[in-house]
């Protein structure tokens, strides 16, 4: 191999509106204490009515491109992961975002892997770059999860927030600046654990109608148990495969879904507090955006430097899951 895929830059963006736990008390049987005790979340950000996922994503993307010392015209491929796309079926949010960046006549597509979206993005970008097909790949996790939440459902609406994270994946000849390894997986037999239903309308050829509300639904207890079990095994596998131990990792950056899930994995693998990056308390679960947002916060706080090894993991609807070992290669 002449070169490896490398994470050259990272950036993030969140809406300005902060929504604290206590605000849910106005319309739900809940409290600040109840939410924080069960999730670790204190507040989250919600986009306004005019903002879409692509609007959040494009701000992060512009900064990621600038931090990689590139222009939008240097980007060869744009891939977006989202569970809250701008449009129901088409065009893809990646196409919309590309246009907002001024990128024309370059491929762009979406990935649907829910909260595991960023790990899937890394896998795709690594494959394209290391095959030699593309040199600079822009990957974006962009979510307006508030657009798919049922604010009558206490089990879901308190968990999520809006935001975006973006990275440029380019080339390097140095292994210790590379996207070292990515593993992704899925099991559709559990698709009914976490899903967003689609409303069916009758047609002249089919009288069936399902008046299901198009909001995110989740079997919380089942998802929690499967997430902990699956992530523990997945993280152990990728470390063993690469002959690494937890102490070899500079930062452990898990998907920011729930503090209890993160804590269970952290304690089992004996990661030290200073190794773990946590943002769930102030952003909630931002789905495909949560890992790049957490990475960006670590970078901007001075905790992540060039050459540092990160361990990433995520679990989401599908069910999907994955993990990655990534050396920070840029900025």
Curated annotation (Swiss-Prot):
Its main location: cytoplasm. Keywords: Acyltransferase, Cytoplasm, Fatty acid biosynthesis, Fatty acid metabolism, Lipid biosynthesis, Lipid metabolism, Multifunctional enzyme, Transferase. The keyword Transcription does not apply. Residues 256-260 are annotated as: ACP-binding. One of its GO terms (cellular component) is cytoplasm. Pathway: Lipid metabolism; fatty acid biosynthesis. One of its GO terms (biological process) is fatty acid biosynthetic process. Pfam families: ACP_syn_III (PF08545), ACP_syn_III_C (PF08541). The active site is at 115, 255, 285. It catalyses: malonyl-[ACP] + acetyl-CoA + H(+) = 3-oxobutanoyl-[ACP] + CO2 + CoA. It is found in: Cytoplasm. One of its GO terms (molecular function) is beta-ketoacyl-acyl-carrier-protein synthase III activity. InterPro entries: ACP_syn_III_C (IPR013747), ACP_syn_III_N (IPR013751), FabH (IPR004655), Thiolase-like (IPR016039). Its EC number is 2.3.1.180. Catalyzes the condensation reaction of fatty acid synthesis by the addition to an acyl acceptor of two carbons from malonyl-ACP. Catalyzes the first condensation reaction which initiates fatty acid synthesis and may therefore play a role in governing the total rate of fatty acid production. Possesses both acetoacetyl-ACP synthase and acetyl transacylase activities. Its substrate specificity determines the biosynthesis of branched-chain and/or straight-chain of fatty acids. Homodimer. HAMAP family: FabH (MF_01815). The last Arg residue of the ACP-binding site is essential for the weak association between ACP/AcpP and FabH. Belongs to the thiolase-like superfamily. FabH family. This is Beta-ketoacyl-[acyl-carrier-protein] synthase III.
């Amino acid at each position: 191999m002449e070169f490896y895929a490398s994470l050259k830059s990272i950036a993030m963006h969140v809406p300005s509106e902060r929504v604290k736990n206590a605000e849910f008390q106005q319309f739900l049987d809940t409290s600040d204490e109840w939410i924080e005790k069960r999730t670790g979340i204190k507040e989250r950000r919600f986009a306004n009515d005019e903002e879409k996922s692509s609007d959040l994503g494009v701000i992060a993307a512009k900064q990621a491109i600038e931090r990689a010392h590139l222009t939008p015209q240097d980007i060869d491929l744009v891939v977006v992961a989202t569970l809250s796309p701008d449009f129901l079926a088409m065009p893809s949010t990646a196409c919309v975002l590309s246009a907002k960046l001024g990128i024309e006549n370059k491929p762009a597509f979406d990935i649907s892997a829910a909260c595991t979206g960023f790990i899937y993005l890394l896998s795709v970008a690594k494959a394209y770059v290391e095959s030699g097909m593309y040199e600079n790949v822009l990957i974006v996790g962009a979510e307006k999860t508030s657009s798919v939440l049922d604010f009558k459902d206490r089990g879901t609406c308190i968990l999520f927030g809006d935001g975006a994270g973006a990275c440029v994946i380019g080339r390097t000849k140095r292994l210790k600046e590379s996207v070292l390894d990515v593993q992704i997986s899925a099991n559709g037999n559990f698709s009914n654990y976490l899903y967003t239903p689609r409303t069916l309308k009758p047609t002249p050829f089919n009288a069936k109608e399902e008046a299901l509300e198009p909001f995110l639904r989740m079997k919380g207890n089942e998802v929690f148990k499967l997430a902990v079990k699956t992530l523990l095994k997945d993280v152990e596998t990728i470390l063993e495969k690469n002959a690494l131990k937890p102490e070899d990792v500079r930062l452990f950056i898990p998907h920011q879904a729930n503090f209890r899930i993160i804590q269970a994995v952290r304690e089992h693998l004996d990661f030290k507090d200073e190794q773990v990056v946590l943002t769930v308390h102030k952003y909630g679960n931002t789905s495909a955006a949560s890992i790049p947002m957490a990475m960006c916060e670590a970078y901007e706080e001075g905790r992540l430097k060039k050459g540092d090894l990160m361990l990433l993991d995520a679990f989401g609807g599908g069910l999907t899951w994955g993990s990655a070992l990534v050396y920070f290669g840029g900025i």
